[in-house]
Every structure is written in structure tokens, then in C-alpha cells.
């Protein structure tokens, strides 16, 4: 009996010790278990992906930028985005624009899909990495000035895909040449062309071509309008260009600008009309108002001359006879003719109102009436407007029409 009681007491004592131990462990776990949990390492069964810096370091290790990708005959696709055309300078026949140029090619040596990359493409510092890899060294060979934008940093974007495809884009401000005959000025067009080609690789090494999956030239603004011009057409083409080092692919971007001639209609043509019309007023003043008629005619001629000079000063020096030259000179001729008519009337009116021009028509076997100053004024008030109307029909419908057809 005593033995049973002793065993029970031992069990009760051990149970109390066990409960106190569990309580102590619970209190300790309340503060220390998180630390222990952090120290526990869970086995990672998946392979960790490789970051961009590690990939760049590995693919450039032993890379030679002088070697042609794939052994040669690299295909480089070109795309142009036109951001803005800032101005067209007629005196120097050039235009200034901001564009994005995109170059795409494939370099198998830069493929990194086997390196378990974290993403299928990576954007890198174009200004730095581009100098370490092969690139086509292409440029606008006919540009007068070209600068890559550097605000707030150099605007060069370079993206490398896991299969080795390269996407190179940069934003550039350049000045290129334009051509125009000016024969139809002010209803003329400016045709501006940019030639893009590889500067160091001929067709045996690199094939330059326009991109085919999307339009090769895109106007980002939708339409481009300048104070004097509006962009009416743009196109892309290519041709082979022969140089001493070989044959090169040349990509051509053509931009056609139509002049907005509303300014010249208001500032040149309308004043010319008014000057010619004013010169006709002298026909109604009579032979007695010779000084007044002279003032009207001379002032009209001087006003037209100064107006013409202001327009010519803003145009390039060219030997072509422009449409506006024909208009201004013809208008001057009409005003000058009115002054000649005034001189005849003044001559007839020197001896009074009975002065006249004797006609001798014996060779026609008919009688001629004498031409008095009044009759000459009356005839001039009809002949001059009719002649000017005929000139306008010829100028606007025949002369300009033929010039426009010839220059298209």
C-alpha cells in the first residue's frame, strides 16, 4: 500500500515538473521563436534567375565588337518617327527637324536565353553599352548638321532581347537640304530629302532596309504645319549607291511641303490689284487734272515697286523667272501704260480742249475721226480693264496651270 502511494506521488511530482517546463518553453517561444524561425533555412529547389548586370557582364566577356554578327551580311531594319519640323529656311534651302531613328538587327553573340534570365529583354545604358557591341555605324550622309539630344541625358535607348535581337533608338535634331525651282512661287513646293546609310559597311557586309512590319516613317503629331508651309506628303525609298569602297544601301526619306500662299495673296496680289485699279481712276478725272492724275499714277507705281522689293528680299537669289515676278512686272506695265496714256492726253490738252490727233487713212480709202483727249480717256477706261481681265485669265488658268503640271 505504501508502495502504491509512493509511486503516485512520484508521478504527480514529475507531471508538475513537466507542466512547468512546458510553460517555460511557451514563454521562451513567445520571444525567441521568431528568431529561431529566421535562422531556419528552407531548401530552395528552383534555380535563381540571373539579373541584367550579371548577364551583361557574361555576354560581353570575350565579345569582339569588330566581328560581324553571324559571320556577315547583317540585315538592319530602319524606322523613323518624325517628332517635329521646326522650320524651313528658303535662303539656304534647308529644313530643320527632330526625329527618332530606330535600328534593329540580330547578334547571336548577345543571346542570353540559356542564362535563365529574369526577363526576356533588358534595357541598358545605350550611351555606354553601344560602344562595346557591334553596330552598323549608320548616319544621314547628306545632313548639314546632326546632334543627338542630351537633355537631361543623352537620348539613346538600347534594348537587348534574349534571342540576340537588338533594338537601338535615338533622338536627333538635324538640318537637311531641300530643293525647289521657285518657278511657281508663291504656289510652290519644297521637297526635302534625307539619305541614311551605313558609313563603314557596304552591301557585302550589311544590308540596310526599311522596316516592313510597320510604316517606315511615322508622323507623331498627325500633321505638321509651319507658318509658311504644311507637310502634304512623305515617302520612303531605297537605292544602291556606288562609292570607291563598294556598293552601299541608301535609304531615302522624302518630305514634301506645300507653301501656304495666303500671306502672299493678301500682301502682294491684293495690293497689286488695288494699285492697278487706282491707276484707272485717272481716266475719269479729265484732261484738266494732269498734276493729280500724275500723282495717282506715280504713287501706284512706287507702291507696287516697294512691295515687290520686300518680297524678293526674303527669297533666295535665283535666275528662274517666278510666277510672282510675271504678276508684279505685268501690273507695273499696266500702271506704266496708264502714265503713257496720261502723257498723250496731256500733250493733246496743251492747246486747249480742241487738241486732237490727226489720222491719215488715205491708204485705206476711208475717213478717220480725230482722237481727242476726252475720246482717248473714254477708250482707255474700256481697253485697260478688258486687257487686265484677259491677262488674269491667262495668268491664273494657263500660265500657272502649265507651270504646276511641269513641276509635279
From Swiss-Prot:
Disulfide bonds join 178-192. Residues 18-262, 317-325, 402-408 are extracellular. It comes from the Eukaryota. Glycans are attached at residues 39, 121, 163, 223. It is found in: Presynaptic cell membrane; Cell projection, Axon. Keywords: Cell membrane, Cell projection, Chloride, Chloride channel, Disulfide bond, Glycoprotein, Ion channel, Ion transport, Ligand-gated ion channel, Membrane, Signal, Synapse, Transmembrane, Transmembrane helix, Transport. SUPFAM superfamilies: Neurotransmitter-gated ion-channel transmembrane pore, Nicotinic receptor ligand binding domain-like. Disruption phenotype: Grossly normal movement. In addition, in response to induced acetylcholine release, there is prolonged and slow decay of excitory postsynaptic currents which results in increased release of synaptic vesicles during that late phase of synaptic vesicle release in cholinergic motor neurons. Knockout in an lgc-46 gain of function mutant background suppresses the slow locomotion defect in the single lgc-46 gain of function mutant. Knockout together with gain of function mutations in lgc-46 and acr-2 suppresses the convulsion defects in the double lgc-46 and acr-2 double gain of function mutant. Its main location: membrane. Residues 1-17 form the signal peptide. Residues 284-295, 347-380 are cytoplasmic. This is Acetylcholine-gated ion channel acc-4. It comes from Caenorhabditis elegans. The lineage of its organism: Eukaryota, Metazoa, Ecdysozoa, Nematoda, Chromadorea. The gene is acc-4.
